[in-house]
């Protein structure tokens, strides 16, 4: 109907689509933003990146997209601040990297959790800082009291009491999922984090196609018909062979003498003097170079034939 807007289906949250969005954002950030003309584009791009990452994250942890985050009641009462600590089981799993699992590459996993739950998620306590020397220097200083505690995740939220309790409960459930170690090779969240890190570094490649050159060659092979050809014979290079003898051979002269010595009836002319029969009389001299001495001689059909039926000279001679 007229006036209705056509709603297009949103692209599926795939790693390739996320990589395209990341590349677009990187390209847009490199362009000069005169008078804020890209503000709306940047906002839409950030929203799409957030949607794709959210769907991929939910598919990874829950198996399907969770829609409960938008189901919040209306605010009732004043703003309240709630918080809860979840201690990391580092004593039970001393070799497991819980901090990297919670934060993700460049903090993307923690930011995704914050966007979904509406809570502030921070890693605190011993071992929460990457720089161990800096952690020891800050221990005991003001605002660094948490370094004296065991490693934990601090979840805080500010909202009305009824809404804050729902948000905090959801955040605690999501963080508890991250505190359960997965077997090596079966950690889907870790695979997603490594994929995101490769996208950010520009080193992500599709696992189905190893390289663009290989994909192009496979497509060309599938479309082009296959032609079976026989083996190519090994022959000497024709360009290196002398196209014609460098000097006239004795064959035309012998044929001319033999023809003139015969009568019309086929009998020898009485006045004709035939060449004496010597061992050298049957030799035809072909002056080829030594490397081509074993090559077959040029066929006599390559020489011109005059009107009398006698083979002509290979090269014209001066009369």
Curated annotation (Swiss-Prot):
Concerning SUPFAM superfamilies, the annotation shows: Eukaryotic type KH-domain (KH-domain type I)
Q: Which domain of life is it from?
A: Eukaryota
Enumerate the SMART domains for this protein.
Answer: KH
Q: Alphabetically list the UniProt keywords.
A: Cytoplasm, Developmental protein, Differentiation, mRNA processing, mRNA splicing, mRNA transport, Nucleus, RNA-binding, SH3-binding, Translation regulation, Transport
TM helices/strands, residue ranges: none
GO biological process terms, alphabetically, are: mRNA transport; negative regulation of macrophage differentiation; regulation of astrocyte differentiation; regulation of mRNA splicing, via spliceosome; regulation of translation; skeletal myofibril assembly; spliceosome-depend formation of circular RNA
Principal location class: cytoplasm
Show where the record puts the motif SH3-binding.
Answer: 276-279
Ranges for domain KH come to 87-153
Q: Which GO terms describe its cellular component?
A: cytoplasm; nucleus
Q: Where found?
A: Cytoplasm; Nucleus
A single Gene Ontology MF term assigned here is: mRNA 3'-UTR binding
What is its quaternary makeup? Homodimer; does not require RNA to homodimerize.
Similarity comment: family membership:
Belongs to the quaking family.
Protein name, entry field = Protein quaking-B
List the source organism: Danio rerio
Designated gene of the protein: qki2
